[in-house]
């Protein structure tokens, strides 16, 4: 007999062309984190956010989301390992029938926890690294012991039968060593490697001048990655390399989250529900799971309906024949760079604000900011930012 809980309580509301199902639930369990990565996507003012949801409140979120059709859950943060109830949350997600992911720095992970999470039903662990070099990794992480811990836990994850999934955020300070990064991943017997060039939200946006690679750096890094792909394929090697470029070097925007409020739903540590993890910065009052059901949040709330469909679009998006491909791009990026979330994403060459992007590219060619000069993500800096805003 199956131990998966039936999904029957909530009346089924079929998806429409403008409102899909919330298939992917990101559970940001906490903003607490032992590391200080200067490219973290968490809000700059995370230190002033409210009290974290309780175990029971997360159970309710997962139950309601599953009843609506959510299929996959990612436990993230901050660092989700600081939550003492993580194994309980994993077990409940498994009982409900979710495919479960743990997105972690590996700091705080132990062999005992890896076993406990396996017993609870965890499907997938993704461990992030800052660099292939111990000194650079630890400098970016703000921890002298981070690299050694990550190596040990990556090996333990592999040993206990999880898919080996590694994530490296690349930027101007580590991208030139992408060959060393790939070699480290192969040595760790990684199954999947995400070489994700920094996306400029949260702390990464604050530090953009010191993080954005040059065009030449990106071209070289992608060429090296492709050389490894060819070699691995020829050897019938199982490792898959995923290279993610920053939109700052594109001429068309990404179809962010496959459309606003279409398949992706984030719940933040204090219960605020968002259509993407960067949306909290917008001047929109988003609903909280303490006050509303997930069904109301997804289908009826103003925040989730604000940029659905196409009627909200101004020019040049409104008359663009590509709007059904990219949905006008990223609303958060439009807000950060132009002050109006309804504007076309400035990444698009048709945007009236595309000059902001070309200027950023130009600035990357002459940037001299060192790692030590970056603003690191920590409570002190967050409180200073919150106080000044």
Curated annotation (Swiss-Prot):
This enzyme's EC code(s): 1.21.98.4
Record-given protein name: PqqA peptide cyclase
Pathway listed: Cofactor biosynthesis; pyrroloquinoline quinone biosynthesis
Tree of life domain: Bacteria
Cofactor dependency: [4Fe-4S] cluster
Keyword flag Metal-binding: yes
Class in the EC hierarchy, top level: oxidoreductase
The family this protein is said to belong to: Belongs to the radical SAM superfamily. PqqE family.
GO biological process: pyrroloquinoline quinone biosynthetic process
């Amino acid at each position: 007999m199956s131990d998966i809980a039936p999904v029957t309580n909530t009346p089924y509301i079929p998806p429409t062309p403008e409102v899909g199902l919330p298939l992917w639930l990101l559970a940001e369990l906490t903003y607490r984190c032992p590391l200080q990565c200067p490219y973290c996507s968490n809000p700059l003012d995370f230190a002033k956010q409210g009290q974290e949801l309780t175990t029971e409140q997360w159970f309710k979120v997962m139950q309601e989301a599953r009843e609506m059709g959510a299929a996959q859950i990612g436990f993230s943060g901050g660092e989700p390992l600081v939550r003492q109830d993580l194994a309980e949350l994993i077990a409940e997600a498994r009982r409900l029938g979710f495919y479960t992911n743990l997105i972690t720095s590996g700091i705080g992970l132990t062999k005992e926890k890896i076993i406990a999470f396996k017993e609870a039903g965890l499907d997938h662990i993704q461990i992030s690294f800052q660099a292939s070099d111990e000194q650079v990794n630890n400098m970016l992480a703000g921890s002298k012991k981070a690299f050694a811990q990550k190596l040990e836990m990556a090996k333990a994850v592999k040993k206990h039968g999880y898919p080996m999934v590694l994530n490296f955020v690349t930027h101007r300070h580590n991208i030139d060593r992408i060959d060393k990064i790939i070699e480290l991943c192969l040595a760790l017997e990684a199954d999947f490697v995400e070489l994700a060039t920094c996306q400029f939200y949260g702390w990464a946006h604050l530090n953009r001048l010191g993080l954005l690679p040059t065009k030449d750096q990106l071209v070289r890094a992608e060429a090296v990655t492709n050389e490894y792909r060819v070699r691995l394929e020829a050897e019938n090697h199982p490792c898959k390399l995923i290279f993610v470029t920053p939109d700052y070097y594109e001429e068309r925007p990404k179809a962010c989250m496959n459309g606003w409020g279409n398949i992706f739903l984030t719940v933040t540590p204090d219960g605020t529900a968002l259509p993407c993890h960067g949306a909290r910065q917008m001047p929109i009052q988003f609903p909280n799971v303490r006050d509303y059901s997930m069904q109301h949040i997804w289908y009826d709330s103003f925040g989730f309906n604000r940029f659905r469909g196409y009627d909200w679009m101004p020019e040049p998006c409104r008359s663009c024949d590509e709007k059904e491909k990219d949905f006008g791009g990223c609303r958060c990026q439009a807000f950060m760079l132009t002050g109006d979330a309804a504007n076309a994403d400035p990444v698009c060459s048709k945007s009236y604000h595309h000059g902001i992007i070309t200027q950023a590219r130009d600035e990357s060619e002459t940037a001299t900011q060192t790692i030590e000069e970056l603003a690191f993500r920590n409570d002190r800096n967050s409180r200073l930012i919150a106080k000044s805003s």
